[in-house]
Amino acid sequence: MPRSLKKGPFIDLHLLKKVEKAVESGDKKPIKTWSRRSMIIPTMIGLTIAVHNGRQHVPVFVTEEMIGHKLGEFAPTRTYRGHAADKKAKKK
């Protein structure tokens, strides 16, 4: 179920402070965060946010189409390496 409109979007305060500071100074350095649950807001457009995927920080460049989505949607946590090949078929 989606979040109530009267509450507004959720964003961690520590991340919001970093975003506002980067916008003020015009800094283009990636903002490192572990907050995958934070929603992308319009002030983040044009910034690069390094989102943690459990192993490393994945750089995510925020565009206009991403507004309203969560940061974690753009940093996949699982890697799919394919199913094991059939060993009998390889020998022939």
From Swiss-Prot:
PROSITE patterns: RIBOSOMAL_S19. Pfam families: Ribosomal_S19. One of its GO terms (cellular component) is cytoplasm. GO terms for biological process: ribosomal small subunit assembly; translation. InterPro entries: Ribosomal_uS19, Ribosomal_uS19_bac-type, Ribosomal_uS19_CS, Ribosomal_uS19_SF. Belongs to the universal ribosomal protein uS19 family. HAMAP family: Ribosomal_uS19. This is Small ribosomal subunit protein uS19. The lineage of its organism: Bacteria, Pseudomonadati, Pseudomonadota, Gammaproteobacteria, Vibrionales. The gene is rpsS.
